[in-house]
Amino acid sequence: RSVSRGLGDVYKRQPEDMLKAMRLYRAIKRVCKDEILRVVTLSCSKMIERTGTTGCLALAMLNDEGILAGCEGDLQSIFTLLAAKALTGKVGFMANPSMINTRTNELILAHCTIGLKQTEKYIIRNHFETESGIGIQGLLPTGDVTIVKCGGECLDEYYLSTGTLTENTNFINMCRTQVRIKMNTPAEYFLKNPLGNHHILIQGNYEVLLNEFLQANTCKRTE
């Protein structure tokens, strides 16, 4: 069932799951405050093993509060988030290409966390891979989007494309937040030689702005 933003729906989660996730959020936020951090990334698998909960809720809340927070120690994606925020003023959605259809030129991006402010509605669920803890199923507005990723050993390569977010999907075999994108460039890139797994989705068309910045810094565009 749908819910209004800021309220949230809880889907088969126990109170202790929320308590553990909130304790982790408070701990990470305290570290960020003490160390004066504006950007952070977690080692998600180790975090689950050591704390018995997931970082998905913590990352969502930190991003909403202006601390750029990413998953799985992915520094290239964190840099991409940082550059995108500086240029566009928007927090991106870090996600995995989870379904690629080269015939229709469509892509589904999915992940178990997203800043709640990026969503129209959201549902509190569990983490897909472990079926434990807290995961976020965010429902995003349809419309123009930009997909970008900075990569390469020296962060001197980048992928940049635009498309249209056409649908929020709800497949059982992928992460909780899922969006279908009709790409404006060939989706084959994600199968052939992508710049890593995570890519960043920004709501709106910022191709010209991002391309000018990356070209000015002598980065090479890959397609």
What is each residue range found by the language model?
Residues 10-29:
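Active-site loops and adjacent core secondary-structure elements that bind or stabilize anionic groups
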Residues 135-223:
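Extended hydrophobic packing segments that form well-structured cores
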Residues 50-55, 105-108:
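Short acidic, glycine/serine/threonine-rich loops at helix termini
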Residues 31-53:
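Hard-cation-handling environments
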Residues 1-11:
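Single conserved hydrophobic/aromatic residue that forms the stacking wall/gate
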